[in-house]
Amino acid sequence: MAAESSYGFVYGVSGPVVTAEKMAGSAMYELVRVGHQELVGEIIRLEGDYATIQVYEETSGVTIGDPVLRTGKPLSVELGPGIMGSIFDGIQRPLKDIADITQSIYIPKGVSTNALSREARWDFVVSKDLRVGGHVTGGDIVGTVDENLLIKHKILLPPSACGTVTFVAPSGQYTVEDTLLELEFAGRKQKFSMLQVWPVRNPRPVTEKLAANNPLLCGQRVLDALFPCVQGGTTAIPGAFGCGKTVISQSLSKYSNSDAIIYVGCGERGNEMSEVLRDFPELTMEVNGTTTSIMKRTALVANTSNMPVAAREASIYTGITLAEYFRDMGLNVAMMADSTSRWAEALREISGRLGEMPADSGYPAYLAARLASFYERAGRVKCLGSPEREGSVTIVGAVSPPGGDFADPVTSATLGIVQVFWGLDKKLAQRKHFPSINWLISYSKYMRALEEFYEKNYPEFVHLRTKCKEILQEEEDLSEIVQLVGKASLAESDKITLEVAKIIKDDFLQQNGYTPYDRFCPFYKTVGMLKNMIGFYDLARHSVEATAQSENKITWNVIKDNMGDLIYQLSAMKFKDPVADGEAKIRKDYDDLAEAMANGFRNLED
C-alpha cells in the first residue's frame, strides 16, 4: 500500500476531465491513477491544492471522494526489442496481449499490462568495443538483437547515462529486464537492461541536426517526380473524405524506402486499422534472398474513433517517440499520422472542458504551437553516442478538413509548418483519377535540397520535371480557350501540348494502386517514362515548327495518323512490371521506344 500522502481525492468529474484535491506536490504532466479501477490519467493543470487530470479511459463510475494515486513519473513509453510487428493503443498498451488476457474484443477499464513482453527471450550479441573498465556515454551501442530479418535492433544506453563499465553480460539469451551492463559514475552504480523508459512529450536528444538530402521514394509517380519529399522531411496530405488520403499513407508505409514505419491511426475508422492489419502481413519483401512480411518493420499505434478522446492526444506523442527511438539506432523512419485533424479535435474538446478561451473555429489558441512542436521532431540527425551514425524521422500527416476546405485552421496551421504539400482534389477523385493529387496547388520546398542527388544519379531529370510542369501549366491555360472556341482553332503546337498533357495526366500521373505492375513504380521507371513522353513532345514540336513554312506541312493530325502505334506504346509504358521484367529489360525497352520515335519523326520529315 502506498503512503497515505501520495493520494488525492476526486473533487469533480466532467467527461474525460477530472478535478482532484489534496494534490499539492504533484508535477505538471505527471501520470496518475484515478478511482478504484485505477484509470490512467495525466495532470494537465495545477491550481493551489487542486489538479486537473485528463483521463485516458472511460470515466463513467468515478465518484467524488475516489482516491487518486500519484505515480511520480510522466507518461512514458517502453522502448526495447518487441515493438516491431505489434499494435498498441494510444498509451502503448499492447492490444493483442489485452485480448489474450481478457478474452474480449473490448478493452476493459483500468487494465494495465506491460507494453513489451517480459517473458520473450532475445538473442543478445554484445558490442565488440565494450569491456570492463571502459568509459561509455549516453547513446552508445551496448549490443545488438536480431529482432527479425528486417530490423537489427541496436541496444542503446539511455541518453542520460554515463560512467565506467563495471560489468558486461556475455552474449546469449536474455529477457528485456535482465541486467546487461553495470556502470559506475561518481560512486553510484547503475544497472541497465534492454528496456528503456522515455517520457513521450520530451524529444530524444541528438548530437546535431543535419540537412536532409536523400529523397523519400514512395513509388507514386506523381509524388516522386513532381513533389518529392526527403528522408527527414515533413509532409501534409490534406483532402476531403474519399479522396484517398489513407491509400496514399498506406502505400507510403508499404513501398517507401524507409527502414522502419510507425503508423498512427488517430481517431480514424476502426476498419482502416483492421485493413492495415490484414494487408501488411500478406505483403512481402526480399531480404538477402529470403522473403519476409512487411509487418516486421511496422509498428501500429491504433486509436480509433470509438476509443476515449483524451488518448488521441497521447497517441501522436507515443508514435513520434517510438520513431525517434528507431532513428537513434541509425535507421530512416517514416511516421504516418492519420489524421492530425482528429488530434486537433481532441485538443479542442479537452480545451473546451477546461474552459479555456477558444480561438479560430473553437480550436484552442495554442493549436499552431502544438502542431509545430510535433512536426519539428522530424529531421535527419547525427545520433548521440558512438559509433557515429545518422538517422532520420519523416512525418507524413494526413489532414481531413471538414468539407475539404483548405482554409480550415488545422490545415492552415499545418501548411505554415510543413515543407511538402500534397493537396488532394475532390474533383479528380470524382473523375476516378487516383492518386488524386492536384498538380497545380501542390508544392515541395525540397527541390533545391535534392538537386545534388538527381545530378549524381539521374542528370537529365531536373530538366524533364521542369518541362513536364510547364506542359501541365500550359494545358491548364489552354483548356479555358478550348472550352470557348473548341480545339480546331488552336495553333498546331498548342494541339501537341494538349495531347501530350493528356498522355502525361492519364498514363503518368494516374496510377492504379491495386495492380501488380502499377502499385509501386521504382524511380528509374518514373524517369524513363517521363523522358520518353517529353522526348515525344520535343520531337513533335520540332517537326511541326520545322515544316511550318514548306508545302507539305506536318500537322498534329498527320502525326496522329502515322504514329498511332508509337503513341499507344507511350501510353503502355506503365504496364511494364518492375518485379517480373526487372530493371535492365525495362530500361532497354524504353530506350528502344525513344529510338523508334526518333526514326519515325525522321521518316515523317523526309
UniProtKB/Swiss-Prot annotation:
SUPFAM superfamilies named in the record: C-terminal domain of alpha and beta subunits of F1 ATP synthase, N-terminal domain of alpha and beta subunits of F1 ATP synthase, P-loop containing nucleoside triphosphate hydrolases
Any single Gene Ontology cellular-component annotation: proton-transporting V-type ATPase, V1 domain
Single biological process term from Gene Ontology: lysosomal lumen acidification
Cited InterPro entries: ATP-synt_VA_C, ATP-synth_a_Xtn, ATP_synth_asu-like_sf, ATPase_a/bsu_AS, ATPase_F1/V1/A1_a/bsu_N, ATPase_F1/V1/A1_a/bsu_N_sf, ATPase_F1/V1/A1_a/bsu_nucl-bd, ATPase_F1/V1_b/a_C
Pfam families given in the database record: ATP-synt_ab, ATP-synt_ab_N, ATP-synt_ab_Xtn, ATP-synt_VA_C
EC number: 7.1.2.2
Entry's Gene Ontology molecular function annotations: ATP binding; ATP hydrolysis activity; proton-transporting ATPase activity, rotational mechanism
Keywords linked to the UniProt accession: ATP-binding, Hydrogen ion transport, Ion transport, Nucleotide-binding, Translocase, Transport
Annotated ATP binding sites: G239, A240, F241, G242, C243, G244, K245, T246
Enzyme class: translocase
Catalysed reactions, as listed in the record: ATP + H2O + 4 H(+)(in) = ADP + phosphate + 5 H(+)(out)
UniProt record similarity statement: Belongs to the ATPase alpha/beta chains family.
Subunit note: V-ATPase is a heteromultimeric enzyme made up of two complexes: the ATP-hydrolytic V1 complex and the proton translocation V0 complex. The V1 complex consists of three catalytic AB heterodimers that form a heterohexamer, three peripheral stalks each consisting of EG heterodimers, one central rotor including subunits D and F, and the regulatory subunits C and H. The proton translocation complex V0 consists of the proton transport subunit a, a ring of proteolipid subunits c9c'', rotary subunit d, subunits e and f, and the accessory subunits vah-19/Ac45 and vah-20/PRR.
Function: Catalytic subunit of the V1 complex of vacuolar(H+)-ATPase (V-ATPase), a multisubunit enzyme composed of a peripheral complex (V1) that hydrolyzes ATP and a membrane integral complex (V0) that translocates protons. V-ATPase is responsible for acidifying and maintaining the pH of intracellular compartments and in some cell types, is targeted to the plasma membrane, where it is responsible for acidifying the extracellular environment. Required along with other vacuolar ATPase components for the removal of protein aggregates which form in immature oocytes in the distal gonad.
Designated name of the protein: V-type proton ATPase catalytic subunit A
Protein source organism: Caenorhabditis briggsae
Gene name of the encoded protein: vha-13
